[in-house]
Amino acid sequence: MEQAAGEPSPFLVRSDCLYTSCYCEENVWKLCEYIRDHRPCLLEQFSAVFISNENKMIPIWKQKSAKGDGPVIWDYHVILLHESARDGNFVYDLDTILPFPSPCNTYIREALKCDSNIHCDFRRKLRVVGAHEFLQTFASDRSHMRDSSSNWTKPPPPYPCIQSAESTMNLDDFISMNPEVGWGTVYSLAAFTERFGDTTLASH
């Protein structure tokens, strides 16, 4: 595993994480489930972070699927945020080539960069949902990963679809960056950087 200098030894190791390509929301849900089952006292320190915008076109750098140094343009992406009063904030992203986890400042600087030099159509917003709430409310029947003939566009995870007590499919409510919809808090990238990262990065 990769570990950033000065970073505490994480209990989540990339090779131990359940991962399915192109199902980032479920990968993060499974990370939250692992924390709940193995370190429940830490669950309140973690949040799922959905990254998207109104156009569902967001650039993210340092992705494993990128060609060269450029960004990948996703319709949305999901990462896990760890807020530690002792060690600082860290990001877990199973699709990045950055260390796992990465200090939040490093992830913002290297993977998200800033919106000031990006066309307005591609500017990112982030919905932060506490891990406990995410585990209780998220549901996906994976219908967004089927084509018009009901064939899978990407192979699904090996476990059953995730359901909540209220729903079998509410992914769009998490991807939406309308603060009146869904759960958690919606931030601009600058506001997210101010809240969770180094404030000097927000304006650069």
UniProtKB/Swiss-Prot annotation:
GO terms for biological process: protein modification process. InterPro entries: N_Gln_amidohydro_ab_roll_sf, NTAQ1, Prot_N_Gln_amidohydro_ab_roll. One of its GO terms (cellular component) is nucleus. The keyword Transport does not apply. It comes from the Eukaryota. Transmembrane segments: none annotated. GO terms for molecular function: protein-N-terminal asparagine amidohydrolase activity; protein-N-terminal glutamine amidohydrolase activity. Its EC number is 3.5.1.122. Keywords: Cytoplasm, Hydrolase, Nucleus. It catalyses: N-terminal L-glutaminyl-[protein] + H2O = N-terminal L-glutamyl-[protein] + NH4(+). Gene3D superfamilies: Protein N-terminal glutamine amidohydrolase, alpha beta roll. Its main location: cytoplasm. The active site is at C24, H77, D93. It is found in: Cytoplasm, Cytosol; Nucleus. Monomer. Mediates the side-chain deamidation of N-terminal glutamine residues to glutamate, an important step in N-end rule pathway of protein degradation. Conversion of the resulting N-terminal glutamine to glutamate renders the protein susceptible to arginylation, polyubiquitination and degradation as specified by the N-end rule. Does not act on substrates with internal or C-terminal glutamine and does not act on non-glutamine residues in any position. Does not deaminate acetylated N-terminal glutamine. Belongs to the NTAQ1 family. This is Protein N-terminal glutamine amidohydrolase. The gene is ntaq1.
